[in-house]
Amino acid sequence: ISMPFVLLSTLLTPLSILASWRAITHRVREYMIAFLVLETMMVGMFVSLDMLMFYLFFEAVLIPMFLIIGIWGGARRVYAAFKFFLYTLLGSVLMLVCMLAMYIDAGTTDIPALTAHQFAESMQTWLFLGFLASFAVKVPMWPVHTWLPDAHVEAPTAGSMILAGVLLK
């Protein structure tokens, strides 16, 4: 299931860079570094077989996206970058709590082992609700979607391409 996302991110990143080839005129080196770090974090997230590594890569994606929006974005880029960062970071706290609960119950962060583990039905319900709320911010779903319009409008074209094409999936 992750291979299509790996292919999508490795195809979309160079296309995004090409789309912004003439538009980005200042701090070009840092811009390219941010995109390559972003691509590395996305691929790491999609190939992780450990819940902790998935979480670290999933959250590390925020840093280059914050920089891409905040440095190379539009007029309200700083506001949009901080709103994006804070919303998605706060949504991730609940994900971390759910992952911690899974680790305490199963004794492992290995994703294949977690899929084989039998969680109590009540715990499954709480984990579902916790992950749903967490991903509702990340995806984004109503009513926790208000960061998205600002991030898309203020991000450079390439940042919007990655945001819409990969990260919101």
Named regions from a protein language model:
Residues 59, 138, 169:
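Conserved G/P- and acidic residue-centered "switch" motifs that form tight phosphate/ATP-binding loops
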Residues 144, 157-163:
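Extended, hydrophobic alpha-helical segments in both membrane/secreted and soluble proteins
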Residues 1-93, 152, 156-157, 166:
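Internal transmembrane alpha-helices of multipass membrane proteins
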Residues 8, 86, 129-136, 163-167:
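Hydrophobic alpha-helical transmembrane segments of multi-pass membrane proteins
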Residues 92-151:
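Juxtamembrane/interfacial segments at transmembrane-helix boundaries in multi-pass membrane proteins
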